[in-house]
Amino acid sequence: MSMDIPETVSLRKFRDFSARQKQELYETLLELAESIDELPKKSLRKTLELTLAVLEYKGEQVQQLQESAAGGLSSDRRLQDENEKLKRMLQKLEDERDGLKSKAKELGEEIRQLELRLQEAAQQAEISDKDSSDPLSELDKQEQLLQNIDSKNKHIKRLLKEIETLQNQNIAQSKTIVLHERELQTIKANLVQLSQDITKVEQERKSLKQKEQQQALEITRLEGNLTFLEVEREKQEVEMRQFLDKYEAKSLGWRQALDDRDKEVERLKKQLEGKSISSGQTNSSNSQSQQEEEHAKLRQLLESREQRIEKLEEKIKSMAEEMVSSTRAMNQLCQEKERAHDPEQPRACCQMIEERLREATARCQQLSEMLEAAEQDNVLKSQQALHAISALEAYKRDEDGLIPALRRCSGLEQKVAARDKQLRAYIQELNSLHEVVQENELLRRKLHIPDDVVIMAKNVHSKQRNKDKQIERLTLKLRTSEELRLQLKLEKSELRRKLLELQQDSPQTLNESLQAPSEVGEVPHSVHLENSPRRGQGDGAASSEMQNRYDEVLAENETLRSGMYEILEKLREYDATSEHITIDSDLLRRLIEALPGGTTTPQRLQGQLLELKAREEALRQLLEQQNYSDSETGELSSVHSLCEVPEIAEEHPVEEDAVLNTATRPSSPTEATMGLRRPTVPDPEEKPTNEALAELSILRKHYDELRLHMSADGSDLMNRNQELHDQMIALELQLEQQRNSYSYMRRDYDQLLTETRKQELRFIDDKASLARQLEHSKSELCEAREELEQVNRRNLYTAEEQQKLEHRNAILSMQLGQAMEQLLGELKPTEICAEYGIIRENYQLDYITAQDFEEQQQELLTWRSKQAELQRETKQLEGLLHVANEQIHSQQRLLNEITDNHINLRHLVADLQSSSDEKLMLAKVQRDLDSVKAECSRLETEREKLQLKADCLQTQLEASELSLKQTQQDFQQERTNSDIKHKFLQHSLFMLKDKYAKFTPLVFLTNFVFAYQKFQRRLEEEQVQQRHRDHTALIDEVTAVVQAKIGLNEESSQQLVKLIKSETQTRLLEQRCEILQAKQEELVRELGELRMSQATDTEHWSTIQALFGEGEPRSQLKVDAETNTDAVAPNLAMRRAVQLIDRESSPIGSPLRKHPHLDTATQTLEAQVEFSETAVQTNGILSQQNQAVQTADAVEDNRRDSRAELQKMQETLQEANQRIEILGKQLEASRSESRESASPQGGVVEKTILSFHTLLLEKDQSIQKYQDLLQTERDQSQQALSKQVAENESLRATVNNLNFNIKTKDAEIQGLKEKLRQKPEVPVERNPSTDSRSSSSSDSSVNELTDEKIEELFESSSVERPPQEELEVPVEAGPENIVTEEPEGEEEKQDTEELKEVPTLHKQIKDLKDKLEYSERSLKTREEEVDILKEKLKLCQEREKSVESTVNPELDQLRIFLDEKDKHIKDLMDTLKNFHDDQQRYIKDTSNFSEDQIAKLAADLNRTEATNKIYHTQMEALRRQLANVTQREKQARDLSQSLRQQLLKRPVVSIKTELNARVKNENQLKRIQQLELDLDEARGQLQRQQTLLEAKRTRSANEVQLWEKQKRYQQQAEKTKARLEETELALEKTRALLQAARTTIARLEKDKQILESKLGRNGPPSNSSGGNNLKCCRTPSCPNLQHVGVSKFAPSPSESPETYTGPSSECSSPAHHHTQIFDQSQLDLIEALKSRIELQQRKIIAMELEGRGSNALTTELEKLQERCQAIEAQNIRLEARNLQLQLDSDLLRQGDSSDRLQKRIKHLEDYIMALKEEMARNESRRELGSGLKVSTNQGQSAEQTILSLRNLVEKLRSENKFLKDGRRSTESRSSMDSTPAEAARLQQQHAEALEKISALQQELQKRTTKCSQCGGRSKDAANEELKFIKEQLVKKTQLLQKAKVLLTRAAAKEKVLREQLALWKRKCSELQNVPVIDEISE
């Protein structure tokens, strides 16, 4: 069928097939491998096509499967996990199967051995049948068999014991495991406890930290208070001084007034005296009445004066007293000041406040404790009352009486007893289990079994059952044997009876002797012994020997008979159980005949006859003795009568013994017979004569005694009779007793008999069941045999052969494995993957058949079902166990409850018995409390259990997670391995050409690869040729076009310029192009080599993949992305073939199909690259290349980039070639023209001159245009700036208005404060903090502008200047012939940059507007706060009215409060403002943070929020609890009151004793203590939670602050980076411009020098013009001004745009000079121009094309020197700038600026001196040197300036270090709290410093004017520079001043705000008990 596949199935048919048919075809193709040689050659191709199609179909299937796998990964994982589980199950089942197989083998061997034994037994049986003539030998064999069985039984017993020991060990192990688990649980619990302890410790630590922080805050607050008090004290001192001054002035005034009065009094006295004398002299005649009136007047005046004097004296006294009091007050104040200064002694006010606080807190605590105690007492009393009432009611209803309680107690005791029994039983079970575990451990140790190994007990149990069955069988056999023995005994007794019947004809004596009552089977030997005392006398030695022999024979017969019976029974059993044992009927018949013959044996009859003979002999002897003593018959008869009683007494116990013997059967029949027989057999022959003589002597003694008796008295006889009578009574009693005992024993015997019968019946039943079991086992054995036979039939080989084969197979497999390992080591299995089949680790193969696989599947299903059943059973068992545990727990709980009830009842009984009702109540309460406590403890234990459970579950979860991870990892690894194996299998199918089969002709692959290589080479050659062809054609076309253009439009000068430009560009581009081309070629070559190597190494589909796998999509992409290039591709036909092969051959999906996302990524990457390439211009290709190299990580990306760049370069190269062609033609044309112009023709000369003039005019026009454009743009920017300035001004005005409003508000606040102060005498001083605050708030907006923006504005101005200077460089270099186009483009860029700066200014304006809005908002908030403060003020005033005694301190406190609150408000406003600014910045600059940081911060914030929420909820819950508690307390109080009333109403039952009261009090105290402890714990928990909350809040606040700081730092860093990048860009631009300008200027200057030298040779007028030139030229590259332009090439902030002037008429337009000289020396000028052009051409050709020559070298060196100098100067400037900024910042931080200013002045002086020295040197050099010396001087001067600047930088650095060190040492509070006097001093110093600076500046100006007069025009630039530097210095000083002012303000603000914050925090915490962080964070 396989031969006809190609005929029956074609490709078309195959495609129409269904999936099943395709699968069948695939399988048939796989089967083809066997019959591969039979295939005909013609159908090979078709089969190959078919196989390829099948493989393609399979590949598609694989791809679909992979897609589905990729789609449903989650389900796949689950399935894989299940698969893993099933694999493990399979592995286990296989292991078990192997074990079962091995067991089956062992059983088979055992069965064979048993069969052999059975055969041997059968043979022996046959032999025994044959040799049946000898029954003894048969018996021997039977005995041997029995011995074997016994040995087997012993072996079984030993095994059973071992199994038991193993089980015990197992149990012990399980117990130890349980113990270990418990230990583990305890350890876990301990761990949990430890972790809790750790958390507690951490919480305590945190609380301590918080306390420390609080203390620190308190310290800071106290320090603030101290400073405030100091300030107040100083104020009071000032006031006191003022007061004293006033009073002193007043006192002085009073003294002066007093003196005046005294003088007036004296004068008046003198006047009076004078008047009195004059009146006495002149008017003696006047009447007495007038004198009296005058005297009265004078007296009145004097009295009035005296009164006035007294008043004044009183006033003076009062003043003196006031002075004294004031001095005392002053002294007190001084003392207080000293005390305040003393740091150890605390202040009085603080002490008072602290003491009061302490007292208040102590009082509060006492009150709270009293309250709590009272409440607790109330609760307790209410509870007691309730319980008492309930108890009383119960008592009344007889529910709680004594009798029911006792009944309950008894019932409970019974229950307790029952529980105790149960517990004991459980304990016994547990002990037994422990013993089992110990036994198991011992057994494990003995057998060396490790603890981990689990031993299955099923087999052991089954074996044990079998052994038990065997034992039961054997016991049954024993019982049957015993029954047989019984039967034998019965038969024996029957025979004896028959014998006795036969011997009835014997004498009467015998009959009498035999008539004794006897049991069945008893030998009546006792009677004979009693009746015949002389039976031992008789025969001699011969008879005894015969008797012995006879006895031996009898015993042998008996043993043989019993053995025969046993053997017969065994044979019957064997016959029943086994098929093989067959007993002959003859043998059985013989045995049966032999056995009953034993009943009538002659031995027994002979024994009986002998006995009878012995008896007869004894009777004869007795008769003879009677005849001998005939005379003494009467005496003898009396003796006999006397002796009969003891004989009778001796007979009874013998009989009873006999009865007992019959009841107790002997174990073996032989022993019984012997025991019965030995005493019965008499030996009359053995009795000697001496015995008879001894008897006679005894009889004589008796006779003598009788005689004595007879001769004795009647009394003696009576006594003797009495004794005998007593003896007889005793004997009768004994007999009665013995009878009773006998009856009892008889009853017992009957019971035992019935029991034995029942047991026999049971044994019969058991026997029947065993027989059934035996039948069942037989059937099983038959089945096993059949199976064994089947196995034997299957296994054709014997066991030995099988073993040999297995051994050989193992050796071969080992060899094969080694060979495979070696082979795979050579083949590199990592590359090829793995072999086909089930691949092991050693790369061996196992093939499995379909049948085996199906069997395995079925087994798997069965095992799964079994597993499901087992799981179900285990679940059920677990459920049962759970239920049992719950029951146990419930029982334990019940027990506990019962015991508790029992105790309660006892208490109740005791309470009832006690007389007092209070005792009863207390007992009840105590019981309830105990029950509650028990309940609490139970709940606690349950909680702990739950915690443990949770921990266990957590650990289990973690373990499961770990295991899951591990399994996932294992699964991944296995999956990768399986994938590798799968791939290797697929590969190996196609690698069979070398190993197994030759149905796939893959030989053409190598040829194909070789052909492909050839094809590639041909393609490359063709491409190279095409390139060459295209190139030449293009050049031809370009040359033609250029010639046409040159012929028509262009002039020679323009051509020359273009030529030079294009040549330089093309050079550069060529070099770059060559480098990139080389790179690209190398990469392409490497790629090709790689592909070829891969193709040759791997299989055919891999080859195709390697060669063409990535070809199509990538080429398409390239065509789409790069429209200019064509992808290198083979022919269409070739590609089609490749596609067909790829589609048909590769069974694995191509990597392009597998990974579509990779393609998209590459597409996007390529697109990005292309986009960047299109955006970049031609001059930036190198930088772009570098970027590409940096960004590309893989070789593929590099290759793509290099290709793209190469294509670009090729384009640029083509353009350059075109340009070269054009320029070459232009050059040729210009040369020809120059040659033509060389001929002396006037017209041509005029034309050339005109062309030059036109060229210059055009250039001037273009320059003018650019200048106009620049001017317009500048005007526009100026307008925009002016607008912005106006806007800024308006904004500032608004800000000022707002500040004014704030000031008014502050004034209002001040007014309110003044109202507060009630003393009108003390002058109200305004608080400096408010002033500073108002000033700071007024300048806040300006400060913000100046702080943040001044530096940026200054930098922007300095950055704006250089581009303008750079723009003017090419403008000045305009009039020359050769002008580049690049600077113009640069100018445009700079203009656009200037325009770009406008939006930044707009942004600034927006920011200002935002700030304005914010300030308005803040004003509103301020107003609201003012209102609040007013309200608070009112409240404070009311309080002050109420509290009159403490007015002053309260006023001070209010003032402090107001200040603090203002500060706090300000601080909050600032923090809010900062927060808003940070938010806005963060929103603007989100890119500053990385995503990870943001995510972390967000997570932290979320966490903190969550924790805060949790804490809030906890707090709320606690509050609710508190509310509930309060409600309950209220209810309890009400209840207690009601109960008290009830108790009062109730009659008193009993009198309270002191003892009871004491006990009660003690109990109550204990309870109170306990409840207090509980309350303290609850409070502690609350406090802990609060502290935790506060800690969390502080942490979150700290985190927020850190975050804000980080944001600020990042923003600053970003700003600085941006500035740095801008400066670098500006530097690069200026460098490029300068390089271009230098090159052009250097060339022009050299040409100029040559021309001037030529002109100098020709005539004097040219010299004058040259001198003129030298005078007027002011370009930076001019050789006349080389010493001036030291630092011109790199623009600096010190240079302004005004230093450069526009192009002067003298210097910029050479046409002017030419027109002056044209008339005089026209021909000379033409010659000079010609020579100049020639020189230029030569130089250009020499420099640009060859790149060699001394001129080029010199120019290059000059360029390098200039660049070096420029860079060094710039670096120094930047360093100086950086140091300056650092110094400024340090200065601002330090706070004191006097030393800094002095040092700054000193540095400025040094700098001016250095500049003077430089100027002097320049002058001297200018006077001395010229020509080459000039250049050297220039270099030296540059070096000197650099050195001086470096020295300056060193000084600045040292100063910076000093400042940094100084700042660390001087930072303290004293520096922060600088007084106004110090500020004034600093201002004075600053003014002096400014004066010094101005003086120095004036001196400098004078010197510079002198220098300018001396130096002339050359010093102008230096003067301008100096002026600029001065301006800069002035600006800097101004900036410094502003910064200082701002810093001082900021420091003051900060201080005030800190104080405010501290106070506000304190107040808030005191008033509201709310943490301050909450307010800030919210």
From Swiss-Prot:
Taking the record's annotation, the residue ranges forming a coiled coil are: 76-384, 471-505, 853-887, 922-970, 1192-1233, 1405-1439, 1501-1654, 1726-1935
Q: Which portions of the chain have biased composition (kind: Basic and acidic residues)? A: 1313-1324
Give the intrachain disulfide bonds: none
Q: What is any one of the record's Gene Ontology cellular component terms?
A: cytoplasm
Q: Where is the composition biased (Low complexity)?
A: 276-290, 1329-1341
Which superkingdom heads the taxonomic lineage of this protein's source?
Eukaryota
Q: Where is this region: Necessary and sufficient for function in ciliogenesis, transition zone (TZ) assembly, and recruitment of DZP1 and Mks1 to the TZ. Also required for subcellular localization to the cilium basal body?
A: 1-650
What does gene deletion cause? Adults are severely uncoordinated and exhibit disorganized spermatid cysts with dispersed nuclei, likely as a consequence of the severe defects in axonemal elongation. RNAi-mediated knockdown in developing sensory neurons results in defective microtubule (MT)-microtubule (MT) and microtubule-membrane connections (Y linkers) ultimately affecting cilia formation leading to olfactory and gravitaxis behavioral defects.
Alphabetized UniProt keyword annotations: Cell projection, Cilium, Cilium biogenesis/degradation, Coiled coil, Cytoplasm, Cytoskeleton
**According to its UniProt record, in which tissues is this protein expressed?**
Expressed in sensory neurons type I and in germ cells (at protein level).
Q: What does this protein do?
A: Essential for ciliogenesis in sensory neurons and spermatocytes. During neuron and spermatocyte ciliogenesis, essential for initiating transition zone (TZ) assembly and is required for the formation of diverse connections between microtubules and between microtubules and the membrane. Regulates TZ assembly by recruiting DZIP1 to the plasma membrane where it promotes early ciliary membrane formation resulting in the initiation of TZ assembly.
Q: What is this protein called?
A: Centrosomal protein Cep290
Q: Which gene encodes it?
A: Cep290
